[in-house]
């Protein structure tokens, strides 16, 4: 009964983590453009 719960949590965390990394990279890129780097 625990394995489906763990797999569901992992499957839910993967897209959240990926989107978080994409947002962080995008904000860093925008900040770099504003500074003229």
From Swiss-Prot:
One of its GO terms (biological process) is photosynthesis. It is a single-pass membrane protein. GO terms for cellular component: chloroplast thylakoid membrane; cytochrome b6f complex. Keywords: Chloroplast, Electron transport, Membrane, Photosynthesis, Plastid, Thylakoid, Transmembrane, Transmembrane helix, Transport. SUPFAM superfamilies: PetG subunit of the cytochrome b6f complex (SSF103446). It is found in: Plastid, Chloroplast thylakoid membrane. It comes from the Eukaryota. GO terms for molecular function: electron transporter, transferring electrons within cytochrome b6/f complex of photosystem II activity. InterPro entries: Cyt_6/f_cplx_su5 (IPR003683), Cyt_6/f_cplx_su5_sf (IPR036099). The chain crosses the membrane at residues 5-25. Component of the cytochrome b6-f complex, which mediates electron transfer between photosystem II (PSII) and photosystem I (PSI), cyclic electron flow around PSI, and state transitions. PetG is required for either the stability or assembly of the cytochrome b6-f complex. NCBIfam families: PRK00665.1. Belongs to the PetG family. The 4 large subunits of the cytochrome b6-f complex are cytochrome b6, subunit IV (17 kDa polypeptide, PetD), cytochrome f and the Rieske protein, while the 4 small subunits are PetG, PetL, PetM and PetN. The complex functions as a dimer. This is Cytochrome b6-f complex subunit 5.
